[in-house]
Amino acid sequence: MTLLVEILEAPKITSPGVTEANAPLPEALRDVAAEAGIRMVHLEGPALQLDIRPTMGPGAAWGDFDGDGWVDLFLPQGAGRPEQDPLPHRLFRNQGDGTFEDISSVAGLGGGDASMGALAFDADGDGQLDLYLACQGADRFFLGNGNGTFRDASDLLPPTDLWSASVSAADYDQDGDLDLYVTRYLEYDPRLLPPESEAGGMRREDPLPMLPYLFPGQPNQLLRNDLKDGTLGFSDVAVELGVHDPKTR
């Protein structure tokens, strides 16, 4: 289930001290996702109580993907259930009146990826927002066309088969283009889970292999943007610069 929260009233502090324990609090937040037209259920991995993948929600990326001056919303989808067809990633176009239109079917963003994070940024300096998807498995990268549609450019990324958790952008080498730092999660092996027939008798506090700290971490990536003369590419320089941090999650 997706939530879009509207701030109704920010907390007000008029004087220091302790308030009455039973004093009524004003309604400060309200979920407006349904009335705004944002509907998505993130599905990832088998629906087992002990599988860690269904517990990991997706990220979100805000940005004006169609150049109309309104901030749109991208929600990455998971890989779905094993018995289902792949589900599409979702792009919601802001209509400027507090509502959104689902344009996923024409956005060219595909689906079926086990996505955990997303970032909107301008990779090639053309003024159009591009999208990076952090996934379990190969990450995905899409170049924006500036009209709410994208083209797949994942082949520009160094090949990996890890579990990405999040991604951020900054010009670390001060050459005028944005580089990427991709954090990795863990070496997850679902074969270590108890049989499905035993899942109903397990409790969350039981010392089972689903706990993240029982799995080894994966090294992070620093993807240097090698944009030159209009040609885009990325090189992983995390080990070279000592920022791969292989033991954390």
Predicted regions and their residues:
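Acidic, glycine/proline-rich Ca2+-coordinating loop motifs
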Residues: 1-249
